[in-house]
Swiss-Prot record:
InterPro entries: Ribosomal_uL6-like, Ribosomal_uL6-like_a/b-dom_sf, Ribosomal_uL6_a/b-dom, Ribosomal_uL6_bac-type, Ribosomal_uL6_CS. It comes from Pseudomonas fluorescens (strain Pf0-1). The gene is rplF. Part of the 50S ribosomal subunit. One of its GO terms (molecular function) is structural constituent of ribosome. Keywords: Ribonucleoprotein, Ribosomal protein, RNA-binding, rRNA-binding. Gene3D superfamilies: Ribosomal protein L6, alpha-beta domain. This is Large ribosomal subunit protein uL6. This protein binds to the 23S rRNA, and is important in its secondary structure. It is located near the subunit interface in the base of the L7/L12 stalk, and near the tRNA binding site of the peptidyltransferase center. One of its GO terms (cellular component) is cytosolic large ribosomal subunit. GO terms for biological process: cytoplasmic translation. It holds the Pfam family Ribosomal_L6. Belongs to the universal ribosomal protein uL6 family.
Amino acid sequence: MSRVAKNPVKLPAGVEVKFAGQQLSVKGAKGTLELNVHSSVEVVEEAGELRFAARNGDQQTRAMAGTTRALVNNMVQGVSQGFERKLQLVGVGYKAQAKGQVLNLALGFSHPVDYELPEGITAETPSQTDILIKGIDKQLVGQVAAEIRDFRPPEPYKGKGVRYADEVVRRKEAKKK
């Protein structure tokens, strides 16, 4: 059995799990998420936790059981607590402003960048140079943060650009005469 799949997923109070064939849905205070479980993975709910096992013992199904366990754990955490990713804008004149489902960015281009947020994702701008991406789907929160960062990734000479709050930008020395 996969080492990851051996650990059960604990269900916190207020989180419901429903099975409909291969469809697994997790419902919590923040919303509902669904996952299609691979046919080779067996999911059992007992005593407030979910256990995962491979139906047969080959390598691929054991790996799939571990992957499914990790995805369901992220779903449970998402519907109960949610996920967030913080971005920082570094550079003269770099600004961000959230207006509903649109994030307006001034990133040193000759035009403003308007990023349409997908459904289920919210963005807050506590200051003009900080962006806070929130949502219940871990993959989608990370994807949105990566797409925003890709507009102007941090450059190694001056460090200007959009970076994750916990990112360390390796700096290079300027060319000497």
